[in-house]
């Protein structure tokens, strides 16, 4: 399952990356 993306992050694959 993909992790929930918190505010300030964006889903990228199976993890969340910082949305710059």
Curated annotation (Swiss-Prot):
It comes from the Eukaryota. The lineage of its organism: Eukaryota, Metazoa, Spiralia, Lophotrochozoa, Mollusca. The keyword Secreted applies. GO terms for molecular function: toxin activity. It comes from Conus tessulatus (Tessellate cone). It is found in: Secreted. This is Conotoxin TsMEKL-02. Contains disulfide bonds. Keywords: Disulfide bond, Neurotoxin, Secreted, Toxin. GO terms for cellular component: extracellular region. Expressed by the venom duct. Its main location: secreted. The keyword Secreted applies.
């Amino acid at each position: 399952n993909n992790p929930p993306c918190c505010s300030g992050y964006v889903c990228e694959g199976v993890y969340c990356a910082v949305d710059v």
